[in-house]
Amino acid sequence: MFSLLLLLLLLCNTGSHGFPAATSETQEQDVEIVQKYLKNYYNLNSDGVPVEKKRNSGLVVEKLKQMQQFFGLKVTGKPDAETLNVMKQPRCGVPDVAEFVLTPGNPRWENTHLTYRIENYTPDLSREDVDRAIEKAFQLWSNVSPLTFTKVSEGQADIMISFVRGDHRDNSPFDGPGGNLAHAFQPGPGIGGDAHFDEDERWTKNFRDYNLYRVAAHELGHSLGLSHSTDIGALMYPNYIYTGDVQLSQDDIDGIQAIYGPSENPVQPSGPQTPQVCDSKLTFDAITTLRGELMFFKDRFYMRTNSFYPEVELNFISVFWPQVPNGLQAAYEIADRDEVRFFKGNKYWAVRGQDVLYGYPKDIHRSFGFPSTVKNIDAAVFEEDTGKTYFFVAHECWRYDEYKQSMDTGYPKMIAEEFPGIGNKVDAVFQKDGFLYFFHGTRQYQFDFKTKRILTLQKANSWFNCRKN
């Protein structure tokens, strides 16, 4: 087993470019990470045979493929850099394929009025902060279902919550700082429904380390009968991602309501949906180039692609730029300055790589000279040959000279006049290889700036290598 994984790692390193050669010590550490990960979360040794003695190399490859498919990675059966990166991220301790099931079938609570008890408290936070985090986590689920939760201070509750470390006698020991943050058991008698948090982590109520409210909301989903979701935007996604806004996605809501039924509220709650890159109806809020790559923005997500790696990276905007808001409305790159600008409302942010530049956000009226009637920018693009930036606002476009730092006279003009054929509204635009690509709804127009002609008309998501659009 060890030698097989080492061989797979060597093959990955041989075939990769731009990465330093891994040392034998690093390779051994990576082998150990892969072994432990597949054992803990993908049931690699479910037959009782120790991992180190397994001789069925096909099983290892299949488990790697299973993990890669779950996380939306390129399915190779090899522990490549992307796979290892996901394996090294902090996450929930509940397996992705072998659930903590105490009863057969799909466990659920028969009673919808449940009790919970916090057995002990972490010293990282005040008792009030812990109580509030747990209460809010339960409230997320009660808001979208018929479930109610009552805190008790003594005796046995349906859901017992505790902070423990290492081996805490439930056959699922914690692993110290990082890695496995917490776990919870599905509904059932005894330990069923209980949630355990690793005391070796540092629990917080903000962005630092691990936000207790965020982790508790996930774990209590397991306590209610939910398994992990492959939807990166779902609260039940296994890896820890904290964006500052803890909310249930539509996937989470659909899951809990499939078990317990809809909320008793007269207006049924709904949650944000994660973009499906190959959805033919996909639209974009903003698009920009970034150091040779393309960045597409939708709600709280970005989609990242380039010509060298066909897989689309989908993640939260806040993971890449914590200081940049969700719901961006426009973006453009000035490549020779290595600078990208993001717009929302009357503010804009300038970034270099993953860093927001000092002094931002700034006001669009003061920086660019827009009149007060312009409340926001719909789309923007920097035209490299002329050094001009085009801003699209409703049916008009403005032209800004980046080097003179002033608006050009004669603008605004009607979009249909300046860029004939693309319509009178632009959702997003970028320049690549000398052409402009305009987006409106599900349509994309390739535009030749020199001849003022449309060259092609395609689906908006044609950059994502989808088989069908």
Swiss-Prot record:
Motif Cysteine switch: where in chain: 90-97
Q: Give a yes or no for keyword Calcium in this entry.
A: yes
Q: Which residues bind Zn(2+) 2?
A: 92, 218, 222, 228
Q: Which residues form the active site?
A: 219
Primary location group: secreted
Protein activity control: Can be activated without removal of the activation peptide.
Note accompanying the cofactor annotation: Binds 4 Ca(2+) ions per subunit.
Residues bearing attached sugar chains per UniProt: 120
Keywords from UniProt, A to Z, are: Autocatalytic cleavage, Calcium, Collagen degradation, Disulfide bond, Extracellular matrix, Glycoprotein, Hydrolase, Metal-binding, Metalloprotease, Phosphoprotein, Protease, Repeat, Secreted, Signal, Zinc, Zymogen
Can you tell which superkingdom this protein's organism belongs to?
Eukaryota
EC number annotated for this UniProt entry: 3.4.24.7
Which positions are annotated as binding Ca(2+) 2? 158, 190, 192, 194
Q: Which cofactor does it need?
A: Ca(2+); Zn(2+)
Q: Where does Ca(2+) 1 bind?
A: 124, 199
Which residues are processed away as propeptide to yield the mature protein? 20-99
Tell me what PTMs the record reports for this protein. Undergoes autolytic cleavage to produce a N-terminal fragment having reduced collagenolytic activity. Tyrosine phosphorylated in platelets by PKDCC/VLK.
Member of which family?
Belongs to the peptidase M10A family.
Q: Know anything about its domains from the record? A: The conserved cysteine present in the cysteine-switch motif binds the catalytic zinc ion, thus inhibiting the enzyme. The dissociation of the cysteine from the zinc ion upon the activation-peptide release activates the enzyme.
Task: Name the chain's protein.
Answer: Interstitial collagenase
Identify the species of origin.
Sus scrofa (Pig)
